A protein has these predicted regions:
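Conserved donor-binding loop and adjoining core beta-sheet/short helix segment
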Residues: 46-87
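Active-site/acyl-donor-binding loops of N-acyltransferases
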Residues: 111-115, 119-140
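Short amphipathic alpha-helix that is part of the acyltransferase structural core
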Residues: 1-35
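Short, flexible, glycine/charge-rich loop motifs used to bind or transfer phosphoryl groups or to couple energy/partner
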Residues: 41-42, 67-69, 99
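Short glycine/proline-enriched coil/turn segments at helix->beta-strand junctions
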Residues: 60, 103-105, 127-129
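Active-site rim helix/loop that mediates acceptor-substrate recognition in acyltransferases
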Residues: 31-49
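Acyl-donor binding region in acyl/amide transferases
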Residues: 74-122
Length: 140
């Protein structure tokens, strides 16, 4: 399935957010309480994060937030939150993400996610690059 995609402009955020937030909300179940939907909307409205959507005639099929990370030697597109409709073709998603990364002249895509993403994206040249360890010092 081929999807059209757009970066959501700040002026259009209120129009798209009700539908896109349902997909973004799926990713929050695995985010260790770092943010909620209100936090994400606030960060989007302040342009700290960017929201991209992929859509078909049925509606929004993928929604994800990103940041461009600038390292001394390269830029990376970091995917912060990503939610899809059930059964989305990962190849369609991959085409969108690659084009967005290329438009920012990024040399790498970073995606922190649950273990299932590693298996789902291995065919698209994603690889395991480390482990995130956490220690709660106070109740979150």
């Amino acid at each position: 399935m081929e999807l059209d995609y757009n970066k959501v402009a700040l002026k259009d955020l209120s129009l798209v957010w009700p539908e896109a937030s349902k997909l973004i909300d799926k990713s929050l179940k695995h985010s260790q309480g770092q943010m909620n939907l209100d936090d994400i909307l606030d960060m989007l409205s302040k342009d700290y994060l960017s929201l991209f959507i992929g859509y078909s005639k049925e509606g929004i099929d993928i929604a994800f937030t990103t940041q461009v990370i600038i390292y001394p030697t390269y830029k990376a597109l970091r995917i912060i939150h990503l939610g899809t409709t059930d059964g989305l073709d990962y190849e369609a998603m991959e085409v969108i993400v690659d084009m967005i990364a290329d438009s920012y002249d990024c040399k790498r895509i970073e995606l922190y996610g649950r273990k299932g993403w590693e298996k789902a994206l291995v065919d698209f040249n994603y690889y395991y690059a480390g482990t995130i360890l956490m220690k709660d010092l106070k109740e979150i």
